[in-house]
């Protein structure tokens, strides 16, 4: 896998087009074996879905198209450095390589500042802005134990 400018230009084209369709200024494409498998822009406001970032939307499309949740062998080209949520999704999807154009600082300069999330992740759950409390661990371990012992599970 080697960087190919034509795929980045497509991600940027999707970002530009997305702005015209009431979306945010972000686009992404997923490539496998030199072919675009999926492309999408950010649709947070049009879908009323705060998780509908370009990378997540593109991962969802690629998984549906390929019929798998595992995107090993794929690359993702993003018009911007992914936010923490999208970066996590890239890892969970097992994408092999990430290429991005603009940086998280570039995004922050136009109002998309994720630095507070990076900071929040360094804090203990009870110190975060969204205060978290743990309850009923003993009861909630039951499904974990069932999963651990399940012999016909599909691991991911």
What role is predicted for each listed range?
Residues 1-19, 82, 89-156:
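Zinc-dependent deaminase
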Residues 2, 24-25, 45-53, 81, ...:
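Residues at secondary-structure transition points
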Residues 11, 15-18, 28, 38, ...:
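Small-residue (primarily alanine) positions within well-ordered alpha-helices
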Residues 22-26, 72:
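Short, basic and Ser/Thr-rich N-terminal targeting/leader segments
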Residues 26-34:
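Short beta-strand scaffold segments in enzyme catalytic cores
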Residues 28, 67-68, 122-124:
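Short secondary-structure boundary/capping segments
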Residues 37-44:
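Short beta->alpha transition motifs characteristic of CBS
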Residues 52, 56-93:
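Helix-adjacent hinge/juxtasegments
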């Amino acid at each position: 896998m080697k960087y190919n400018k034509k795929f980045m230009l497509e991600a940027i084209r999707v970002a530009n087009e997305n702005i015209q369709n009431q979306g945010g200024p972000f686009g992404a494409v997923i490539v496998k074996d030199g072919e675009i498998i999926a492309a999408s822009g950010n649709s947070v406001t049009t879908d009323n879905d705060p998780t509908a970032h370009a990378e997540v939307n593109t991962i969802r499309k690629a998984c549906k198209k390929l019929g798998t949740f595992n995107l090993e062998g794929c690359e993702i080209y993003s018009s911007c450095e992914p936010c923490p949520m999208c970066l996590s999704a890239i890892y969970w999807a097992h994408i092999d390589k990430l290429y991005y154009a603009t940086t998280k600082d570039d995004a922050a300069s136009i109002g998309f500042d994720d630095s507070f999330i990076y900071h929040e992740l360094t804090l203990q759950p009870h110190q975060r802005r969204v205060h978290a409390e743990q309850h009923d661990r003993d009861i909630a371990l039951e499904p974990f134990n069932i999963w651990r012992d399940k012999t016909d599970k599909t691991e991911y």
